Design a protein with these regions (language model features):
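Rossmann-like S-adenosyl-L-methionine
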Residues: 1-214
Length: 214
């Protein structure tokens, strides 16, 4: 157990006990990945369900050694590094510079050399595509509650990724973005389900796999 005091902002956390705390880590044993994080970082608080969620996402997306995968809203690498264990190359995009730094350190910690991370605001329609002209075989989206509508709008009508794995903490915005994917971007819903990430509450984690129809 570690105890911290937060006077005001998240970056003002002060350790109370012990005075020199060891780094906090969580593990994804199916992917042989260990991720370091700070007390104020966003992580999934249900460690067991997070492990199952990552495993299931990889089963559905099915990355292959010769494929490139784009991980949007990648955070500190929760999906990126497990994806990199199986794909040829993974690019993670995140708007938080501190999380990008931690994702890079986590890649080094796990000796992952085929994952790259870039800083970009995925919610700004004026921001150029942070992946530039690069094309990716598969995408994984794990956005905040507001969803990924601006990202979905960036998808070309033809020639987009073959599969898109969408992980959502808000079924409402997932439904909205799914409508765009299916009715305007040429995808079909191939699989869907929920995980009870917060038992005895109304909140669930939803997952949906989309495949390019054409």
């Amino acid at each position: 157990i570690q105890i911290f005091r937060q006077p005001e902002r998240p970056d003002q956390l002060v350790p109370v006990w012990p005075e020199s705390p060891a780094p906090l880590v969580y593990r994804l044993p199916d992917a042989n990945v260990e991720l370091e994080f700070a007390p104020a970082d966003f992580i999934q608080v249900n460690a067991e369900l997070n492990q199952r969620m990552v495993t299931r996402a990889l089963e559905l997306l099915d990355p292959q050694p010769g494929e490139s995968v784009l991980d949007l809203f990648c955070g500190l690498g929760n999906f990126t590094l497990p994806l990199a264990r199986r794909a040829g190359r993974v690019l993670g995009i995140e708007a938080d510079a501190m999380l990008i730094e931690k994702a890079q350190r986590n890649a080094q910690r796990n000796q992952v050399q085929n994952a790259e991370f870039r800083l970009a605001d995925l919610y700004s329609p004026e921001t150029p595509d942070p992946w530039g002209a690069e094309r990716f075989d598969k995408w994984l989206l794990d956005p905040p509650r507001t969803g990924a509508v601006e990202v979905v709008k960036r998808l070309p009508a033809q020639g987009g990724p073959r599969r898109i794995q969408y992980v959502s903490c808000n079924p409402g915005t997932l439904a909205r973005d799914s409508e765009l994917l299916v009715h305007t971007k040429g995808y079909r819903l191939a699989a869907a389900g929920v995980m009870d990430m917060f038992p005895q509450t109304s909140h669930v984690e939803a997952m949906a796999l989309f495949e390019r129809a054409n």
